[in-house]
Curated annotation (Swiss-Prot):
Keyword ATP-binding assigned: yes
Residue runs in coiled coils: none
The protein's enzyme class: transferase
Organism the protein comes from: Oleidesulfovibrio alaskensis (strain ATCC BAA-1058 / DSM 17464 / G20) (Desulfovibrio alaskensis)
Pfam family, one: Thymidylate_kin
Name listed for the protein in its UniProt record: Thymidylate kinase
GO biological processes: dTDP biosynthetic process; dTTP biosynthetic process; dUDP biosynthetic process
InterPro entries associated with the record: P-loop_NTPase (IPR027417), Thymidylate_kin-like_dom (IPR039430), Thymidylate_kin_CS (IPR018095), Thymidylate_kinase (IPR018094)
Function: Phosphorylation of dTMP to form dTDP in both de novo and salvage pathways of dTTP synthesis.
Reaction(s) catalysed (UniProt annotation): dTMP + ATP = dTDP + ADP
Keyword Zinc-finger among UniProt keywords: no
Binding site for ATP: G7, I8, E9, G10, S11, G12, K13, S14
MF annotations from Gene Ontology: ATP binding; dTMP kinase activity
Swiss-Prot/TrEMBL keywords: ATP-binding, Kinase, Nucleotide biosynthesis, Nucleotide-binding, Transferase
Amino acid sequence: MFITFEGIEGSGKSTALARLKDWLQEHGHGATLTREPGGSRLGGILRSILLDIGNDDLTGETELFLYLADRSQHVHQVIRPALAEGVAVISDRYADSTVVYQGYGRGLDPALLHRLNDVAVRGLWPDLTLLFDLEPEIGLKRATTRNLREGTGATEGRFEAESLAFHTRVREGYLTWAALNKERFRIIDAAASPDEVFEQVRSAVADVFTIG
């Protein structure tokens, strides 16, 4: 069982991730949480480069190859071994983020990015992808508030510092990409309350997998 969470900044993925892991474990399924970038040792180093607000001169192409390196190592060291042991893997972002952020957001070719992703992951695609959909203005406000509260604006806030126009392209890109990949995408209304959001998540997972 391989589930990925996608969405714009501040869409509430992290809270729902933890609740899904607990729910799966309560129903007898081993589960582990991971993230991109940063799910492996190398990924942690790359995350510090990619998200640091001081690195605002990175090109879309530079971002692309750093994310692909992170993803390849993540799949090899974390995701495949866990799946081989029968553990459910729940990842906060995966390959679709690159298609959307560097493709629809930065203007690179989404189809090319999908092919490069397939090389990086060696054909390992999620069984289910949950897209947390939210108006960019709301998401940015949430994310900025979180970074201020946690003191992570400088080290984790590079994408939050992008323009509203960029985040609007990202949101629209996610919806376009989800429509092109309907077989594994489910859209979550991330503007709902945390409990309502999790109920949508639980229902989507139960529709795809046999739980309990």
